[in-house]
Regions:
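Extended recognition/assembly regions associated with phosphoester-bond processing machinery
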Residues: 1-125
């Protein structure tokens, strides 16, 4: 396509798992689409994985914008929002949406003493 339309910007829109995409719990997708699928694009806007991240293919950013808010216990409360792209410069900015008032809180409690001594820890902020 670039050969026929060299002045155009090529944007990949993809909803699915890409190899090496990570989830909030640290799982790394090994069986997703290979990044070579995006050969020839200027940047990629990806969805499906709720963790905001950028995966590069030959220097080309393939960006999961993440989810607007926390969706389940496996996700952190923070780090959610949206991404705004500048198509001409092919750069993007990340914007967080603050939503710590509502969500799933996961606590680490090692013993009953942790509760009695107010030492329980929230582990998904």
């Amino acid at each position: 396509m670039k050969v026929h339309y060299p002045d155009c910007t090529y944007v990949a829109l993809y909803h699915g798992e890409v190899k090496n995409a990570k989830t909030d719990v640290g799982y790394v997708h090994e069986n997703g689409a290979d990044t070579s699928l995006f050969e020839g694009v200027d940047f990629g806007i990806l969805g499906h994985i709720h963790k905001r991240q950028c995966i590069k293919h030959n220097g080309v950013p393939l960006v999961y914008c993440g989810s607007l808010i926390q969706k389940d216990h496996g996700e952190n409360l923070s780090g959610h929002g949206y991404v705004v792209w500048d198509v001409e410069s092919q750069n993007y900015e990340e914007y967080d949406i603050q939503n710590e008032d509502y969500g799933f809180y996961t606590f680490k409690i090692n013993s009953i003493e942790d509760i009695e001594e107010d030492k329980e820890n929230i582990i998904n902020l």
